[in-house]
């Protein structure tokens, strides 16, 4: 029976998403104007925010750009906000968009160096606990200066490479042969060529390393203003530079970093939560043989490329630390330097670098449309007012927990943007002092970054890992990710709360003021970024 036009419409709408999801989005689009015009703009605004959070939470059913974008377009069309307000939000956060476009693409051209480093870690270090700590620390360090998505992308590339090499050799082929590593490894007679126990141990080993690395990106990403996109938004609103941001965050981020490393050690040592899987000796030998094979094939031209990438890496860290240019422009310089000196001049080769970041950049622009609705309809006014009625450290803890809970189910860039905008409005209205605003900015930043490791919804790097081609190969499901992240979620969240509740954050911030490591800011300075647009 031929498909009717209505069936064709539903079939095309949002592609391969489940039918119930398509109906839900269409229902949202019908309900929102009715609520806005006939019930209350405030209620309609909150419903829109919840619908948008729903699209983020269901990211595995459908990438949020399309459903979230439809909701945002309708919101502008019916008057919940204006196109000019959306543009204003995008203008105010232009640096974040440049970070995503240029920095992620720039690091793409440094992948060879990062692959080289992580490969050496696995092949040269035999202790599972030590290699886990190295992966966690290396990811944390890299994520403090690079985009977490890129760091995870590199580690995924390493893991896929190792998995395919093992699969190839275990299937009776040599390193240079073509092979489908996604196959079940059976021969022509249907017999299994692969040792099942060996393969399962190897999968477990890769799962462990990827989860440690994923949490490492959160541990490092929270420390600096370029570690995560929302950090840059918060830094811009507070008018902080790279060094000041790191210093202000340190009373929370340094204890959390040590707690995270200790957690990594403990779960590996006692083999809790699915950790402690060992790399079988036979697999280790295959990987070492392959690394030696690759080293022998590496020409002077290849070695020179690694040297260039290392020099560009030094420039990247120095440029960010000394704030020699805006983050996006430093990213652009990384693209130019690596491609120019490594001979990548083909337009198509350049284009591949931008594929990873642009969908998320477009999604971020949709975030800002929803933020514009929140501002115009004053949705968070009552919530913020309630939180601001509390005093001192309790107020900071409320903001930390509120950000943390929302970041577990929604994207932390969205959550961080909403809260810092609301707190800044409270500062401009004279409800809080500038020093309290700075402390709240720390609570918001750490709140969005740390508890969000709980689920793949909160951390873009985790979602990227879950939706990668590697996840099914190593049997990494949504539920398994949540379970393996649980010890980190509990420890990082509690240590973060304790650092704030105990007064340690406030005391250390005062110490930094007294020692002139940081200076007091004025309300006027906070207005500067907004006034510039």
Curated annotation (Swiss-Prot):
GO CC annotation, single: plasma membrane
Primary residence: membrane
From which residue to which does any coiled coil extend? none
So which domain of life are we looking at? Bacteria
User: How does the entry describe its membrane topology?
Assistant: Multi-pass membrane protein
The UniProt keywords, alphabetically, are:
Antiport, Cell inner membrane, Cell membrane, Ion transport, Membrane, Sodium, Sodium transport, Transmembrane, Transmembrane helix, Transport
Which GO molecular-function terms appear in the entry?
Answer: sodium:proton antiporter activity
Parts of the chain that traverse the membrane: 10-30, 67-87, 98-118, 131-165, 209-229, 247-267, 310-330, 355-375, 396-416, 454-474, 481-501
Q: Which family does it belong to?
A: Belongs to the NhaB Na(+)/H(+) (TC 2.A.34) antiporter family.
Return the protein name: Na(+)/H(+) antiporter NhaB
Question: Organism, per UniProt?
Answer: Shewanella sp. (strain ANA-3)
């Amino acid at each position: 029976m031929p498909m009717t036009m209505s069936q064709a419409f539903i079939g095309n709408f949002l592609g391969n998403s489940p039918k119930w999801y398509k109906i839900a989005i269409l229902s949202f689009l019908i309900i929102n104007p009715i609520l806005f015009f006939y019930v209350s703009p405030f209620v309609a605004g909150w419903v829109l925010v919840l619908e948008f959070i729903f699209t983020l939470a269901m990211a595995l059913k459908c990438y949020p750009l399309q459903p979230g974008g439809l909701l945002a377009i309708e919101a502008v069309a019916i008057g919940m906000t204006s196109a000019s307000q959306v543009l204003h939000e995008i203008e105010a956060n232009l640096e974040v968009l440049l970070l995503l476009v240029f920095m992620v693409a720039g690091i793409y051209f440094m992948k060879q160096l990062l692959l080289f480093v992580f490969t050496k870690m696995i092949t040269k270090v035999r202790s599972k606990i030590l290699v886990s700590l190295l992966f966690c620390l290396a990811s944390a360090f890299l994520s403090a200066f690079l985009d977490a998505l890129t760091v995870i992308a590199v580690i995924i590339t390493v893991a896929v490479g190792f998995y395919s090499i093992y699969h190839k050799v275990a299937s009776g082929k040599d390193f240079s042969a073509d092979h489908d590593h996604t196959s079940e490894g059976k021969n022509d007679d249907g017999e299994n060529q692969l040792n099942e126990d060996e393969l399962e141990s190897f999968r477990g080993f890769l799962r462990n390393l990827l989860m440690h690395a994923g949490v490492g990106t959160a541990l490092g990403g929270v420390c600096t203003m370029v570690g995560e996109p929302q950090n840059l938004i918060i830094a811009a609103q507070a008018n902080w530079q790279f060094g000041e941001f790191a210093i202000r965050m340190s009373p929370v981020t340094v204890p959390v970093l040590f707690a995270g490393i200790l957690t990594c050690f403990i779960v590996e040592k006692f083999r809790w939560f699915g950790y402690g899987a060992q790399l079988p000796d036979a697999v280790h030998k295959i990987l070492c043989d392959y690394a030696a094979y690759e080293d022998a094939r590496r020409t002077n031209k290849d070695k020179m490329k690694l040297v260039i990438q290392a020099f560009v890496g030094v420039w990247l860290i120095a440029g960010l630390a000394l704030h020699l240019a805006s983050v996006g422009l430093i990213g652009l310089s990384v693209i130019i330097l690596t491609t120019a000196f490594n001979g990548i001049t083909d337009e198509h080769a350049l284009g591949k670098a931008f594929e990873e970041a642009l969908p998320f950049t477009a999604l971020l622009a949709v975030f800002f449309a929803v933020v514009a609705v929140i501002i115009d309809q004053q949705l968070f006014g009552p919530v913020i007012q309630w939180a601001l009625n509390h005093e001192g450290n309790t107020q900071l803890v409320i903001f930390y927990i509120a950000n943390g809970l929302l970041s577990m189910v929604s994207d932390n860039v969205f959550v961080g943007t909403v809260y810092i905008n609301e707190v800044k409005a409270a500062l401009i209205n004279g409800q809080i002092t500038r020093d309290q605003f700075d402390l709240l900015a720390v609570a918001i930043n750490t709140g969005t970054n740390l508890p969000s490791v709980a689920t793949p919804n909160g951390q873009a790097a985790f979602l990227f890992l879950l939706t990668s081609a590697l996840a099914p190969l190593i049997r990494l499901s949504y539920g398994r990710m949540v379970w393996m992240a649980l010890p980190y979620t509990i420890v990082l969240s509690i240590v973060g709360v304790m650092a704030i509740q105990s007064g340690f954050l406030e005391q250390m911030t005062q110490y930094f003021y007294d020692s002139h490591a940081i200076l007091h800011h004025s309300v006027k300075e906070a207005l500067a970024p907004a006034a510039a647009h």
